[in-house]
Regions:
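Residue-level signal for mature regions of secreted extracellular proteins and peptides
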Residues: 18-19, 81
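Primary mode marks residue(s) on the alpha4-beta5-alpha5 output face of response regulator receiver
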Residues: 33-217
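N-terminal secretory signal peptides that target proteins for export/translocation
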Residues: 1-9
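Bacterial signal peptide processing site
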Residues: 26-29
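Sec-dependent signal peptide recognition
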Residues: 10-15
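C-terminal motif of bacterial Sec signal peptides marking the signal peptidase cleavage site
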Residues: 21-24
Length: 217
C-alpha cells in the first residue's frame, strides 16, 4: 500500500505496488468479441457509429501490440503484474475486471501501444480473459512556496498553495477521466482512460464500466 501525502517524481515507477500480488498464473481465452462497431464513450448504440480512419488505425496498432497479452505469462514477462489473487472490480454500473499494472510504464507520457494497465476478466475455469486496457497518468502538482513538484497522494484536493502541473491527457481523441483521487491509500490523484479493445462495451469503447460482463460469483 502507498503512504504519505506527497509522492516524489522519482518514485512514480513503484505505483504498481497496490495492484501487485505474485502467485501462479493460468491460461487466458484468446478469442475476443467483435468491437468493430464501437466508437466512443458517448455511443449508447455502438453499431450505429463507426470510428474515424486515424482512430481505427491507432486501435488496430493497439490490438497488435497487446494481442500477445491474451497469454497471461506473456503479460507477466513484459512487466505486468500477475492477475492471480487480485480483486475483480465491479459496481452497479458494470464491471472493470482485474487491473494489472506495468510499473515501468507509469509516468507522464501517454504511449498508445504501451498501456499502463491491462484489464482481465476471471473465467470460471480459473483462467483470465483480456478485455481492455487502461491508460493512467499521475497528477503532478507544484508547491508554490518551495517549487517542488510531486504526485499528489492526499485524500483531498490540493489547495491554493499548489499549482496543478499535469493537464488532462487524451488518447485516440478521447480525454481522460479525472483528475480523481487514488483508489488505494497513498495512490496519487490521476487521470485514466479505459479502452475496450478486446471486448464489446454497449456503453462505448472508451467508457469506464462495461455492463455486458460480470465478475464470477
Amino acid at each position: 500500500m502507498f503512504s504519505g501525502t506527497q509522492f516524489p517524481i522519482g518514485r512514480l515507477l513503484i505505483l504498481g505496488a497496490a495492484f501487485t500480488i505474485t502467485t501462479a498464473c493460468a491460461p487466458a481465452d484468446t478469442e475476443p468479441r467483435d468491437v468493430t462497431g464501437v466508437s466512443s464513450a458517448t455511443d449508447l448504440t455502438p453499431s450505429a457509429a463507426r470510428l474515424g480512419p486515424e482512430v481505427s488505425k491507432g486501435l488496430a496498432s493497439l490490438r497488435n501490440a497487446t494481442a500477445r497479452f491474451h497469454n497471461v505469462d506473456a503479460a507477466i514477462a513484459a512487466g505486468y503484474a500477475d492477475p492471480s489473487g487480485l480483486p475483480c472490480v465491479s459496481s452497479p454500473l458494470g464491471t472493470m475486471g482485474v487491473h494489472v499494472v506495468n510499473r515501468s510504464l507509469m509516468d507522464q507520457a501517454v504511449t498508445p501501444d504501451q498501456p499502463e494497465l491491462l484489464l482481465y476478466l476471471p473465467k470460471a475455469n480459473g483462467g483470465f480473459k483480456l478485455v481492455a486496457v487502461e491508460y493512467l497518468v499521475p497528477v503532478l502538482v507544484q508547491n508554490n512556496a518551495t517549487g517542488n513538484v510531486d504526485a499528489w497522494t492526499a485524500p483531498g484536493l490540493w489547495g491554493d498553495g499548489y499549482t496543478r502541473i499535469t493537464q488532462p491527457p487524451s488518447v485516440f481523441g478521447e480525454t481522460f477521466v479525472g483528475p480523481m483521487p487514488g483508489h488505494d491509500p497513498g495512490m496519487p490523484w490521476h487521470y485514466e482512460k479505459h479502452v475496450w479493445v478486446w471486448d464489446t462495451n454497449p456503453n462505448g469503447m472508451f467508457s469506464q464500466w462495461n455492463p455486458s460482463i460480470s465478475c464470477p460469483s
